[in-house]
C-alpha cells in the first residue's frame, strides 16, 4: 500500500534528521526540466506543498503574464530542507514538515544551503538567477554569486505584496528576454524526468 508519512515537527527535527538528509542527498540526482533555464529562488510558505499557498499562487499569476515564463525554474528556500525545486514539493518530507519560517539563518544552515546549491549544479543547468526570497534574499544572492552565476536580487522585503509582484514581473521580463524559448511539452517531459531521477 501507499507509504503513510507523519508530519515532522520542529521539536523532533534537526538538520540531521534521516528524512532530511535523504532528501538533501538525492538532490544530486535531480536535474531541472530543461537546459538554459533561469533559476528563480522564492521563499517557502507555511502551507505545503508551497504551490498551493496563497503567496505562491500570487507569484504564479504574476509570472504567467511574462513571455517565456516556462523557462523560469522555481526553487523554494527553506530550513531544514534547504532548496526544494517545484517538482519535488510533493516528495517526502517536503510536504510533511511544520516549522516556523524566520528568515534568520545560522552558520550551519548557511553551510547547508551552500551545499544544496552546489548539488543543484547551477553553472551546468541555469543561465541566470533571480532571487525573490524576502528575508532570505541577501544570503541566497551571495551563495549564487559564489558559484559565478549572473544573479539579480529583487530586493523586496514583502515578496508577495502588490509592489513585490510588480518588481518580480519586470525583472523576470528583462531576464528572460534573451533566454531560449521553452514550450509546454518539453517542460512537462523534463519535469517528469527530473522527478523520476530524484525518486529512483
What role is predicted for each listed range?
Residues 13-20, 53, 161-164:
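Polar helix-capping/helix-linker motif
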Residues 110-190, 194:
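Glycine/proline-rich loop-helix segments at beta-alpha junctions forming the active-site rim
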Residues 19-23, 30, 34-120, 177-200:
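Conserved mixed alpha/beta catalytic, RNA-binding, or beta-rich assembly cores of soluble enzyme
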Residues 1-16:
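Helix-enriched interaction subdomains in cytosolic or periplasmic regions
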Amino acid at each position: 500500500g501507499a507509504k503513510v508519512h507523519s508530519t515532522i515537527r520542529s521539536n523532533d527535527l534537526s538538520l540531521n534528521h534521516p528524512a532530511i538528509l535523504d532528501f538533501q542527498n538525492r538532490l544530486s540526482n535531480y536535474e531541472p526540466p530543461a537546459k538554459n533555464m533561469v533559476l528563480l529562488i522564492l521563499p517557502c510558505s507555511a502551507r505545503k506543498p508551497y504551490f498551493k499557498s496563497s503567496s505562491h499562487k500570487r507569484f504564479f499569476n504574476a509570472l504567467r503574464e511574462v513571455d517565456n515564463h516556462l523557462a523560469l525554474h522555481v526553487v523554494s528556500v527553506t530550513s531544514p530542507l534547504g532548496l526544494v525545486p517545484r517538482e519535488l514539493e510533493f516528495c517526502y518530507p517536503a510536504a510533511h514538515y511544520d516549522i516556523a519560517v524566520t528568515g534568520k539563518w545560522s552558520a550551519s544552515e548557511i553551510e547547508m544551503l551552500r551545499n544544496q546549491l552546489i548539488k543543484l549544479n547551477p553553472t551546468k543547468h541555469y543561465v541566470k538567477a533571480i532571487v525573490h526570497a524576502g528575508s532570505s534574499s541577501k544570503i541566497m544572492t551571495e551563495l549564487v554569486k559564489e558559484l559565478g552565476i549572473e544573479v539579480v536580487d529583487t530586493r523586496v522585503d514583502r515578496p508577495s505584496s502588490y509592489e513585490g509582484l510588480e518588481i518580480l514581473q519586470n525583472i523576470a521580463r528583462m531576464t528572460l528576454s534573451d533566454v531560449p524559448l521553452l514550450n509546454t511539452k518539453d517542460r512537462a517531459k523534463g519535469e517528469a524526468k527530473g522527478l523520476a531521477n530524484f525518486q529512483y
